[in-house]
């Protein structure tokens, strides 16, 4: 599937373009925050087996040892995936795009977008920019009218915190395998350890 192939694509882009973004490809742990969450992971595991995906289902004890927390009911490990520093990855992509001739404009607020005869027209003040493709990647900072976003945006409240660098004892017990980790809760929590040894 496209989702299953995505890590190969991302990590190959990082390697080919020498993007410095703390890449770690040690897999990810999807952790069950409840018994119902564990049922969901078991179902995902069974589906993955049908497609011969490299998934491993861990019970509570194994998950406790891999995460360093006793709060989870189990987890699903996907060895294809990993973690990156997303802003550094984005900057690396921008650098490569510039090397290939792309022009990047900052502080260039788009006032209008329309499509005519298969061509996108984007307006910045009095300037019209024509393109074959248009990627709407405005995050929360967009004020185009509803006809432009066509209901494609969802509000996601998310924040990240970083601890002080973990000491050697903590490093040996909190995500010792350096996997990325997130849970099955509707309001998701995620964990990873960065190159500075901080828990993010």
Where are these regions (language model features)?
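Active-site substrate-recognition segment that forms the wall
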Residues: 8-24, 110-112, 120, 128-200
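Residues in well-ordered beta-strands of folded domains
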Residues: 32, 77, 123, 162, ...
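A broad, structure-centric signal for solvent-exposed, well-ordered loop/edge residues
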Residues: 28, 38, 65, 70, ...
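Flavin (FAD/FMN) cofactor-binding and adjacent substrate-gating region
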Residues: 1, 9-92
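Helical element adjacent to the flavin cofactor pocket in flavoenzyme catalytic cores
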Residues: 39-49, 70-133, 137
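A generic, residue-level signal for flexible/boundary positions that often mark functional hotspots
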Residues: 15-17, 49-52, 78, 98, ...
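General beta-strand structural signal in soluble alpha/beta enzymes
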Residues: 56-59, 104-106, 136, 182
């Amino acid at each position: 599937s496209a989702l299953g192939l995505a890590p190969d694509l991302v990590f190959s882009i990082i390697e080919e373009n020498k993007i410095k973004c703390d890449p770690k490809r040690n897999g990810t742990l999807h952790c069950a925050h409840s018994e119902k969450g564990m049922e969901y992971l078991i179902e995902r595991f069974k589906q993955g087996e049908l497609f011969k995906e490299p998934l491993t289902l861990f019970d509570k004890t194994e998950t406790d040892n891999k995460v360093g927390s006793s709060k989870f009911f189990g987890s699903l490990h996907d060895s294809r995936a990993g973690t990156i520093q997303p802003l550094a990855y984005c900057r690396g992509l921008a650098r490569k795009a510039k090397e290939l001739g792309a022009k990047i404009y900052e502080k260039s607020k788009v006032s209008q977008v329309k499509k005519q005869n298969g061509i996108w027209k984007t307006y910045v003040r009095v300037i019209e920019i024509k393109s074959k493709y248009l990627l709407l990647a405005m995050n929360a900072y967009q004020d185009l009218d509803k006809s432009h976003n066509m209901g494609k945006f969802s509000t996601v409240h998310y924040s990240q915190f970083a601890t002080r660098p973990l000491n050697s004892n903590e490093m040996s017990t909190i995500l010792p395998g350096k996997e990325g980790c997130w849970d099955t809760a509707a309001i998701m929590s995620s964990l990873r350890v960065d190159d500075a040894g901080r828990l993010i």
